Design a protein with these regions (language model features):
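Conserved RecA-like ASCE ATPase "motif II neighborhood" in helicase/translocase motors
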Residues: 1-31
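Alpha-helix termination/capping residues and helix-transition junctions
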Residues: 2, 41-44, 256
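Interdomain motor-coupling "hinge/lid" segment immediately C-terminal to the ATP-binding subdomain
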Residues: 3-6, 12-14, 74, 78-81, ...
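RNase H-like, metal-dependent nuclease domains and their acidic two-metal-ion catalytic environment used
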Residues: 6, 50, 56-61, 110-293, ...
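Switch/connector loops and helix/strand junctions flanking conserved nucleotide-binding motifs
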Residues: 16-19, 56-61, 80-82, 270-274, ...
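ASCE P-loop NTPase helicase motor core
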Residues: 20-97
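Amphipathic alpha-helical transducer elements in NTP-driven molecular machines
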Residues: 29-32, 300-304, 344, 359-362
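Short alpha-helix plus adjacent loop in nuclease-associated cores
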Residues: 81-86, 287-333
Length: 435
């Protein structure tokens, strides 16, 4: 209209309908800049935003980066001030300095203590903390179910793994030296214990999510499985589509990890990428089975439905080198865009809203590989250990009955079950591996 103003008050510009996804928040933030062009150029001119944050990634935090001064006035005196980063309103801070106790009502004229108790009971704790305590640190705990803390991060052997690996969120297991790009308070944890014998993996695959040239990436994830526990060895990403150099480099990784199956999403290119891989496999003389998979479910639902149960059971082990590589990847990309390509950024921000994550190639390749092992995940690592010990005990009894002297010699040499069978000629392997 051409009007100008000395004081502009914008009330509740952020609501659930316009801030659910990253793209919607960026659009809303761009619209907010229009207010600055209407403001009169005076020293005392001001723009004031009033509202409650809807997500951890609220635009009010972005406005603070544009020299706006945020002031937070929760309904109760916070139990912990650290989540507010020193942004409590001066009037409320004065009440606290004068002896106001934690969880006291800050504005009795508006909300009584009983009223707030009823609201918290009806809304749920997380929603109450967001809408009334204005604490965004817990607001997306349920909305974003894929947490880095549910992963097991350690050095992964390329050829073998223990029978079982135990997760624990003890602070002593927190890996603070690794870079994290997840939600606030979300860290990586190392295993508490490795159990059982080390043996070769039951199966190893390479999951490929192909793409064309442009902003998307062609991603390869190398995954192994033993006793229902999955191990992510390495992840590779390329920005040149499905060129020969990209496909050959992926096959080099397959050779490194002794990959048995190449799993390729056929939605892109209608199977042409799989045919190109078969051509290169013939040239490199690699005996790898090529399988295609087609996704029919919406991407966000498919990724969460695949990864959430596996993470909740702590069945995904990630090599430390993957975390370092993810953080250092795409060094030439602008800092604000680099985050969008990082695997663990995509993982922690993935929710069921369409378009929640702008770039999801890496998390999609990982989920595709994990889904391949879905049926095998019903295997219990602890049950496999029990079965192996039972077989070992039965073999000892049989050995003791057959030849007592030989049995004693093998115990002295601390031979395992496979070595004892080879020594007695009861193994299919003609050449003993224990000599």
């Amino acid at each position: 209209t051409g009007s100008r103003a000395d004081l502009m008050i914008l009330d509740d510009v952020e609501v659930p309908g316009n801030s659910m996804t990253e793209m919607m928040r960026e659009k809303l933030l761009q619209l907010c800049t229009e207010a600055e062009s209407i403001l009169t150029p005076k020293e005392d001119s001001r723009i004031m935003y009033l509202g409650t944050p809807q997500t951890t990634f609220t635009i009010y935090k972005k406005l603070a980066e544009r020299s706006y001064r945020p002031l937070i006035w929760p309904a109760r005196v916070p139990r912990s001030m650290t989540n507010y980063e020193g942004l409590i309103a001066p009037q409320l801070q004065e009440q606290i300095d004068n002896g106001a106790k934690s969880w006291d009502v800050t504005d009795p004229d508006r909300f009584s203590d009983e009223d707030l108790i009823e609201r918290e009971a009806s809304m749920g704790r997380s929603n109450f903390m967001l809408q009334f305590m204005l604490d965004t640190s817990l607001s997306d705990a349920e909305k974003f179910p894929l947490k880095m803390a549910d992963l097991i991060v350690t050095s992964v052997n390329p050829k073998s793994a223990p029978e079982s690996i135990i997760w624990c969120s003890d602070p002593r297991n927190c890996i603070k030296e690794l870079p994290t790009v997840g939600l606030p308070g979300d860290y990586f944890y190392s295993p508490m214990q490795l159990q059982g014998n080390w043996d070769p993996y039951d199966d190893t695959i390479c999951s490929v999510d192909p793409s064309g040239r442009g902003s998307d990436e062609t991603v390869a994830a190398y995954l192994s499985q033993r006793n229902g526990i999955l191990y992510l060895h390495e992840m590779r990403a390329y920005r040149d589509g499905y060129s020969d150099s990209t496909l050959l480099d992926i096959l080099k990784g397959c050779k490194k990890y002794d990959t048995k199956t190449l799993l390729i999403e056929s939605n892109f290119g209608d199977g042409i990428v799989a045919e190109l891989f078969k051509k290169h496999l013939q040239q490199t003389k690699q005996a790898i089975n090529v399988e295609e998979t087609r996704a029919n479910v919406r991407k966000e639902d498919r990724i969460i439905d695949t990864l959430e149960p596996v993470l909740n059971q702590h069945r995904l082990v990630v090599d430390k080198s993957v975390v370092d590589w993810v953080y250092k990847s795409n060094p030439d990309t602008a800092p604000e865009k680099r985050l969008q390509y990082m695997l663990f950024y995509q993982m922690s921000r993935m929710c069921r809203e369409k378009g929640a994550v702008r770039h999801d190639d890496r998390i999609d390749a990982l989920a595709q590989g994990v889904k391949y092992f879905t049926d095998i995940l019903s295997i219990s690592a602890q049950q496999e250990i029990i079965n192996r010990k039972r077989q070992d005990w039965n073999d000892l009894l049989e050995h003791w009955e057959d030849d007592l002297d030989c049995f004693a010699d093998h115990l002295v040499f601390n031979m395992n079950m496979e070595q004892r069978k080879q020594a007695r000629g009861k193994d299919n392997n003609s050449v003993p591996t224990w000599v």
